[in-house]
Amino acid sequence: MANSKRLFGVVRRKLLRRSQSRITIIRSSAPETTREEIAAVKIQAFFRGHLARRAFKALKSLVKLQAVARGVLVRRQARIALHCMHALARLQVRVRARQLLSH
């Protein structure tokens, strides 16, 4: 058990040294970002966020418009169906009255 712990520690230290050297190389080869580049990235991010919010707002208003239009259509269909049901009820009353009078 003690040997495996020691071996694990040795391997871990070697890996850490390798990863640290890689990190150093990567950092030294990457160009440093200037304040202007950071500011430009922030401005671009804010502008993209603005465009996304504007597109979302337009989509939301379009969905509301669709809901209103569909509501108008449904109310119209309900009114027509109710009118037809009343007409059928009146017709049914007339037919039954005729049947009673003819008997």
Curated annotation (Swiss-Prot):
<keyword id="KW-0112">Calmodulin-binding</keyword>
<comment type="function">
    <text>May be involved in cooperative interactions with calmodulins or calmodulin-like proteins. Recruits calmodulin proteins to microtubules, thus being a potential scaffold in cellular signaling and trafficking. May associate with nucleic acids and regulate gene expression at the transcriptional or post-transcriptional level.</text>
</comment>
<dbReference type="GO" id="GO:0005516">
    <property type="term" value="F:calmodulin binding"/>
</dbReference>
<feature type="domain" description="IQ 2">
    <location>
        <begin position="63"/>
        <end position="87"/>
    </location>
</feature>
<dbReference type="InterPro" id="IPR000048">
    <property type="entry name" value="IQ_motif_EF-hand-BS"/>
</dbReference>
<dbReference type="Pfam" id="PF00612">
    <property type="entry name" value="IQ"/>
</dbReference>
<keyword id="KW-0539">Nucleus</keyword>
<feature type="domain" description="IQ 1">
    <location>
        <begin position="36"/>
        <end position="62"/>
    </location>
</feature>
<comment type="similarity">
    <text>Belongs to the IQD family.</text>
</comment>
<dbReference type="GO" id="GO:0005886">
    <property type="term" value="C:plasma membrane"/>
</dbReference>
<dbReference type="GO" id="GO:0005730">
    <property type="term" value="C:nucleolus"/>
</dbReference>
<comment type="subunit">
    <text>Interacts with calmodulin (CaM and CML) at the plasma membrane in a calcium ion Ca(2+)- independent manner, however, Ca(2+) seems to modulate calmodulin binding. Binds to multiple calmodulin (CaM) in the presence of Ca(2+) and CaM-like proteins.</text>
</comment>
<protein>
    <recommendedName>
        <fullName>Protein IQ-DOMAIN 20</fullName>
    </recommendedName>
</protein>
<keyword id="KW-0677">Repeat</keyword>
<keyword id="KW-1003">Cell membrane</keyword>
<feature type="region of interest" description="Calmodulin-binding">
    <location>
        <begin position="10"/>
        <end position="22"/>
    </location>
</feature>
<dbReference type="GO" id="GO:0051592">
    <property type="term" value="P:response to calcium ion"/>
</dbReference>
<keyword id="KW-0472">Membrane</keyword>
